[in-house]
Every structure is written in C-alpha cells, then in structure tokens.
Amino acid sequence: MAPPARVEARVPTAATDDWGRQPDSLMSAVPPRTLEAGVGARGSGSASSRLWIADTDFRLHDDIGFFIQRMLIRMEPTRPGAPLSLDDPTAMVARIQAGEIFVSDATLATLLNQDLAASRAAVRNLRMSTRKDGQEVRGELLRKGRWRPLRMLTEIELSGPLEVTLVPRRIFVDGVEVTSSLAAASIEMSEVLKLKTRHMELVGNRIRVDLDGLFPPPRLDFRVSRLALADGGMQLALGDSLADLQWPALRAPDSYMFIEGGDIKMARTVLVKAYALFTSLSPGQPLLFNLYDYRRQLQNGVIRLREDGMVQIAVSPVKAPAPLEARL
C-alpha cells in the first residue's frame, strides 16, 4: 500500500519544496479569497467548477490523454446538487470553453483500435506516424479470410466541429500499391471495403472519424475550431479563442491545474467551493495528472492547506508512462 499523502498547514520558511523554492511561494501563488456567508460546510450551492489548465499532460488513464497547452473547462455534475466526484467520471460533463491541445499518434491509434475492435471491423491494429505534411497509417485488412498488411499515406482534414476526415492518397495492400489500379477502374475504396463503426465510416475514398464520444468518460462537450498536423500527432484548437479569456492572476509554475468554484469530491474529502492549485511534485517536470489513477498520485504527493480554504496539491506522476498504442 502506498504511504498516505502528507498534509502540511504551514511549512517553515527555511524549508524548500521540490522546485528549490520556499513552499510559501506556492501557498501564495493563488490570491486570497473571502467565502460568502451562504457557503456551508457540506456544500456551496455552486452548480459548476471552472478548471484552468496550463502545460499539463492530462491522462484519462495511462494510454489515453492529451497534452494541454492552455484550456478552460466548465465542469458540471450530471446530478444536480451533487459534488463532482473524481471517482466517477461518468457522473460529470466537461464543457471545454477554449483550449489548445496536442493529441499524439499513440492516443488516436488506441482510440480507433478500440472502436474497430468493438465493431469487429475488417481493419485492425492501426499505427500512425504523423508529420507536418501528412500521415502514414499502417494496419491490417481482412481480405478473403486473411489479415493482410495495409499501408496508407493520408491527409487529414477538419470536416466539421466534431469530425476529422482521413483522405488516403496512396494505398498499399500486401506491400503492393493499388492506388492507380483502383483509379483506373473507377473503383472507390468503399466499394471493396465496408467500414462503418460507431466512430468511423468509409465513404467513397474518405474515412470520416466522429470525435463526439470517442474519448472515455467524462463526457467531453467541445468543438474543434482548428486542426494542424505536427510531428507525432495533431494540434487542435477547441472552442473559443484563448485570447478572449481573462486568465486568473496566479503566480504559479508554468505547468498547473487550478480549480475554482463548485464542490469537488476527492477520495473521502469534499472541497466546498473548491479553490485548489495542482502542480507537479517532480522538479522541472510538467504536471502529469491521471484522472483514473488520481488516488495513487495523491497518496504519493503532498497536500498543503491555507486558512481561506485554498488547497495546494503537489501531484506525483506515479503509474503514468508515456502513451503506447494498444494492440487489439
């Protein structure tokens, strides 16, 4: 069993934290606040929480997640009056108001492979290699009872607020290029390959990918406003412009999560009208937060409390390796 989290009310100013700075510098990173008289010990009456994120490796679990450069999320419980429980991601909705994220090839491949496997599709074991000028997709194609190597050189387009489209430019089956023969016979890919799953559909020579509900809980309510290919994945702009946001006046490290408002249930504790700053326990490393394994991270982290109810949590990146494709 992991050791319990350490709770420190005030650390002597002579001590230093993992950044080599005095812990009080983190305790004062968030402006002081005054709680309204209507805020009780069991609940604040707030219907939602604002989650501000900067330069954070955010995982839903070990092999699914994305790197968030900047983001504002409004978190709401699905049951009115209930606190947001980190132990039950299905009971919350994350409404992304604005943000910029990087989705790695490994994460996208894992999500699509899970979708293909659930539908027993004739394509499996996708692997992706993305560059700024295009993407290479490798996998296996079921033809005449045999799984055969499949390779495609594709472009990726944003075809809707919740849809991206893979457009194959060159197609190889069993190591043989079939692009020109299909074109010469005026045959579209969908005529020789039937592909329709919950989130993927081959229409003509285009593979549509529906992003709505593709990620595991919590429910993500968002729209993609811009897509750009990058080495190793996709850069997505979500929701409104970040420039229109009034960011909190924090004096925090470059990498953090800041929760403001609402009631948050973590393990057996409820943060009433939450006012919490999450930072990394590892010196010089970005915050890595693993939602499905947050308890283990907190057990190996450090929690500090302030008189006005602000909580500063230094998170340990335990059990959180870099994403790898799930071969199904």
Q: Across the structure, where does each feature detected by a protein language model lie?
A:
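Extracellular/lumenal and peripheral-membrane lipid-interaction modules
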Residues: 4-328
